Regions:
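N-terminal transmembrane-helix/juxtamembrane module of multi-pass inner/ER membrane proteins
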Residues: 3-73, 87, 103-126, 260-262, ...
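Generic transmembrane alpha-helix motif of multi-pass integral membrane proteins
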Residues: 76-82, 142-146
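Membrane-embedded catalytic cores of phosphoryl/pyrophosphoryl-handling enzymes
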Residues: 60, 90, 100, 104, ...
Length: 327
């Protein structure tokens, strides 16, 4: 019970910037270790990228491009939500939702073609500009970099985005202009989400007492996604439904925020347990939604991903009470 009470008080550390990513001042060793780990991961990614460029290996390009796939964002967002900072985790999901919704619309506005299909090394659909993988990854990583202001995280962000962007060109599904456009729009979305949700506008839009997630961003994502479908766009039908459902599920976050913040400031074993449980449930549900969509229709992605998002929040919220009360 003592651990439970201490963890309950710990969520207040959000307003001081204290988290697993930002250790308390004076804890220089832990801070340096975090940067060292992040930079080491960046080095591994950079080496793999270099080898891919030199060998032009399709397998390596596919491995690097997987860093920008849907499953990667599910795992990474849950990791931030449960292990580091609950509000930052939700903000990262909002960045993915906003950027993913916007790129569907941008592709139709610019209507620029991809490289010839005969050159493709993996299946692709829709127009080429901007690169969706590149834009969404840039939004996700730039938001986290702005939030935590760590050198190691900034280095990792650059390495991941560079790897994803280069892999899209290496797989011949995008031109260089496409990935550069994705980076530009991704930075814009990441900066806007940071400013509105975790930066200067947070107090105004979210409400300082409970740190409510700005309602405007999920609503905007739903509107853009639905419009992309109503306009008969040739790209992004399934993605539109997924993003819309996920965005609506995040409206429940203000109701569960305090409990989820307890998890992100709980002892390491509790946080890891929460991360594993939430990730397993989320991945199982997303795979189940694919089977259901094949049997019923792509529209089912909307309610399915609403359920996925809501389940992520509920599991993360329940983990502290299920574990800490037994300690």
């Amino acid at each position: 019970m003592g651990l439970w009470l201490r963890a309950l008080k710990a969520h207040a550390a959000f307003d001081t910037g204290v988290s697993a990513m930002n250790p308390p001042e004076g804890d220089d060793r832990k801070s340096l270790l975090v940067d060292y780990v992040l930079i080491s991961i960046s080095a591994v990614i950079t080496v793999l990228l270099t080898v891919a460029v030199v060998t032009d290996s399709t397998k390596l390009w596919l491995a690097l491009t997987s860093l920008g796939e849907e499953s990667a964002y599910v795992v990474l967002s849950i990791a931030v939500l449960t292990l580091i900072d609950a509000d930052a985790g939700v903000a990262s999901l909002l960045a993915v939702i906003a950027s993913g919704s916007l790129v569907i619309w941008l592709k139709e506005v610019f209507a620029l073609p991809r490289p010839p299909e005969a050159l493709w090394r993996e299946p692709a659909e829709g127009y080429g500009f901007p690169s969706g993988h590149t834009q969404v990854s840039t939004s996700f990583w730039s938001l986290l970099s702005l939030k935590f202001r760590r050198v190691g995280l900034a280095v990792l962000s650059v390495a991941v985005v560079a790897a994803i962007a280069t892999s899209r060109v290496g797989l011949h599904v995008h031109y260089v202009r496409d990935v550069l456009g994705g980076i530009a729009f991704g930075l814009l979305v990441g900066a806007c989400v940071w400013a509105l949700v975790v930066g200067p506008g947070r107090r105004f839009l979210m409400g300082s007492p409970v740190n409510r997630v700005a309602l405007a961003l999920p609503v905007l994502s739903v509107v853009v996604s639905v419009l992309s479908f109503w306009e008969g766009y040739a790209y992004g039908f399934d993605t539109s439904f997924k993003l819309g459902g996920l965005a609506l599920s995040l409206l429940a976050y203000p109701l569960l925020a305090q409990r989820i913040r307890v998890l992100s400031h709980a002892p390491a074993t509790v946080r890891v347990s929460g991360f594993i449980a939430t990730t397993v449930v989320a991945l199982v549900l997303t795979e189940a939604s694919k089977l259901l969509a094949e049997a019923v229709g792509i529209w089912v992605y909307g309610p399915a991903y609403f359920f996925v998002g809501l389940t992520i929040l509920v599991v993360a919220a329940l983990t502290p009470s299920l574990i800490l009360k037994r300690l």
